[in-house]
Amino acid sequence: MLDRIKVCFTESIQTQIAAAEALPDAISRGAIAMVQSLLNGNKILCCGNGTSAANAQHFAASMINRFEAERPSLPAIALNADNVVLTAIANDRLHEEVYAKQVRALGQAGDVLLAISTRGNSRDIVKAVESAVTRDMTIVALTGYDGGELAGLLGPQDVEIRIPSHRSARIQEMHMLTVNCLCDLIDNTLFPHQND
């Protein structure tokens, strides 16, 4: 059992090292897209399933409340957080539409959709991205593996932050770290002296 624990830590560290080399440009571009949207008076919608839903909610909470320093609230909505809306849509046998309907209702041109999917193939996330495209929103996609169907939907203004791993647990760990990086970059760009 102890060896298995060491393997988990070693894999996580190796994934972090690979991501630290491969992802800074994409993470920076994602943060810039979000900052520009916020400066223009827009908002960030975010969604995910399972652990990705937790990461989406963590991002929205960090925007609305704060990340590490006190600062004004920033507009972000976790589309997976409203159980009544989710179950109402799903109850009508529209499971794949649980996020897309919300994007169509709430999303506006200039908003950002933070779409989090470990494999990039979750149908409800794919549909949300398709809806965001029709609303002229920018997409920041957190993926893993080969990026899945999600990667093929992104345009030149969109950003894919693809974790260099084929292990779901490692990808999800790195998605949380990436969300924290995005929050840190947004805060330090919009409120550069708040952490002093």
Curated annotation (Swiss-Prot):
Gene3D superfamilies: Glucose-6-phosphate isomerase like protein, domain 1. Coiled coil: none annotated. One of its GO terms (biological process) is DNA replication. GO terms for molecular function: carbohydrate derivative binding. Residues 34-196 form the SIS domain. Keywords: DNA replication. It holds the Pfam family SIS_2. PANTHER family: DNAA INITIATOR-ASSOCIATING PROTEIN DIAA, SEDOHEPTULOSE 7-PHOSPHATE ISOMERASE / DNAA INITIATOR-ASSOCIATING FACTOR FOR REPLICATION INITIATION. Homotetramer; dimer of dimers. Required for the timely initiation of chromosomal replication via direct interactions with the DnaA initiator protein. Belongs to the SIS family. DiaA subfamily. This is DnaA initiator-associating protein DiaA. It comes from Pectobacterium carotovorum subsp. carotovorum (strain PC1). The gene is diaA.
